[in-house]
């Protein structure tokens, strides 16, 4: 429950200044008295160009409307399967390394109480949340906005393909590790 003040670690590949609702959710949690830190990537959505003022190859720490934001190295989003996978896995790897570091702690120097994973594409963005859960034994709440690997079908991948089967395995592993999954559609519950 969020009645008591919590220290919340948010894992999401995209965050302000990128146009995603998770920014509003985090700012509302701060307004309600919770401590919130976001672990995100370099802003580059949707064009695949890192936004002006954000350095390539550097971790950037800032506070946006009361939310502490840590930006992890991310290869910008590009078209093409290989480039898209590099984008997905660069964030997954760098965010996981960060959450396991001594630097990823709440303002009191202790672990966060809960991890909130705002899951858009790709599902692998949840790897950092799982790593934090495993290290500190805290729960993960996932807000699932993009169902994997089903979202790959919209991109022309067939269910019989090796790519689909691989990401089906990855997705099942990730979804099983969540303590709670919030969904945007009742149809998601049939899959999850």
Where in the sequence are the language-model features?
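Helix C-cap/helix->beta junction micro-motif
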Residues: 32, 132-136, 177
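A conserved catalytic-core segment of Leloir-type glycosyltransferases
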Residues: 40-102, 106
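N-terminal subdomain of nucleotide-sugar transferases
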Residues: 1-63, 180
């Amino acid at each position: 429950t969020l009645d008591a003040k919590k220290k919340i670690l948010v894992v999401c590949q995209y965050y302000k200044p990128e146009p995603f609702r998770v920014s509003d959710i985090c700012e509302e949690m701060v307004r309600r008295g919770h401590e919130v830190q976001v672990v995100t990537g370099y802003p580059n959505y949707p064009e695949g160009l890192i936004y002006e003022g954000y350095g390539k190859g550097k971790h950037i720490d800032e506070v946006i409307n009361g939310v502490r934001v840590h930006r992890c190295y991310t290869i910008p989003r590009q078209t093409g399967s290989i480039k898209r996978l590099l984008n997905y896995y660069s964030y997954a790897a760098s965010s996981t390394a960060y959450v396991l570091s001594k630097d990823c702690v709440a303002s009191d120097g202790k672990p966060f109480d809960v991890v909130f994973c705002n899951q858009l594409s790709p599902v692998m963005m949840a790897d950092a949340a799982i790593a934090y859960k495993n290290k500190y034994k805290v729960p993960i709440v996932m807000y699932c906005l993009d169902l994997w690997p089903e979202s790959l079908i919209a991109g022309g991948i067939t269910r019989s393909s090796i790519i689909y089967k691989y990401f089906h395995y990855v997705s099942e592993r990730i979804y099983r590790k969540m303590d709670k999954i919030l969904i945007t559609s009742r149809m998601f519950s049939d899959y999850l």
